[in-house]
């Protein structure tokens, strides 16, 4: 079986709100049977609106600074930080830095639905 390589610059990103682009790098379209992974690019001030999933989501910030929301708690994180949003728990992120933030995301399923939640953070 050949290696299925995803070149991030060749992937069409999808807008996830003003200043936020998500690129799925591994999912069912790349042959995955049980995982979805991707990269989210947030421009300064860009916000991933609060939402939930039926499954957990792992996140790792590789560049920039974010204010994150998980449940009813917030924190400010810098590159080199990872966190988990358990299944059905509201979470979101806002770029509070001066430059682009780059976030790696991963889910333990190829079926990932997002459900918006109307909360402020």
Name these PLM-found stretches:
Residues 56-57, 61-66:
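Glycine- and acidic-residue-biased ligand/ion/polar-headgroup-sensing regions
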Residues 1-34, 114-121:
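A short, N-terminal "cap"/entry segment at the start of jelly-roll beta-barrel domains
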Residues 40, 84, 99-114:
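A short hydrophobic beta-strand segment most commonly corresponding to one strand
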Residues 72-87:
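Short acidic-glycine-tyrosine-enriched beta hairpin
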Residues 38-53:
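Conserved short histidine dyad/triad with adjacent acidic residue
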Residues 44, 54-55, 73, 89-90, ...:
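A generic "binding-loop/recognition-motif" signal
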Residues 49-50, 68-69, 85, 91-97:
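Short beta-strand His + acidic residue motifs that chelate non-heme Fe in jelly-roll/DSBH
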